[in-house]
Amino acid sequence: MSSARSPYLRFGLIFAAVAFLLDQVTKWIVTVPLSLEPKGQIELTSFFNLTWAENCGISLSMFASCTDTTRWTLVAVTGIVAAAVAFWMTREQAKGDVIALALILGGALGNIVDRVRFGYVVDFADLHIGDFRPFMIFNVADACITIGVLLLVARALLLGEKAGQADAKPSVD
């Protein structure tokens, strides 16, 4: 990460906004027009259902108690993480890393909005093979965060120091 302003910052912020909006719009579609109710389910295919889940905690049901203390602690912690990711994005010179950070930022903000509005995060995407469910029920924000983290890890492992050099904007002297 450089101390110079990222040449991809505007792009990253737009990308984060799109991720955030996709998350919020899909949650609205599932809860309002489709009228999916808490603990309700709509079977779309043999491997994908829309299943309403109210997630008071974080992944794998950690911190799942639905208390005000848990709610506001998770809002604060997620807000701090989102601020750190946004700051990192302002300095990141590699376009691929900015995309990954934007996904994480947009997803984090989407889940923060849910937690502030409802006290829980609305999850609805239920991928399964018969009765086998390899994933927890999730939402677009969760998918964005996961994909963003995996992109950062993959780029760090596969490209290493070359990541910033490979897709950074060339400087004009």
From Swiss-Prot:
The keyword Transferase does not apply. It catalyses: Release of signal peptides from bacterial membrane prolipoproteins. Hydrolyzes -Xaa-Yaa-Zaa-|-(S,diacylglyceryl)Cys-, in which Xaa is hydrophobic (preferably Leu), and Yaa (Ala or Ser) and Zaa (Gly or Ala) have small, neutral side chains. The chain crosses the membrane at residues 11-31, 69-89, 93-113, 134-154. Keywords: Aspartyl protease, Cell inner membrane, Cell membrane, Hydrolase, Membrane, Protease, Transmembrane, Transmembrane helix. This protein specifically catalyzes the removal of signal peptides from prolipoproteins. The active site is at D123, D142. This is Lipoprotein signal peptidase. It is a multi-pass membrane protein. It is found in: Cell inner membrane.
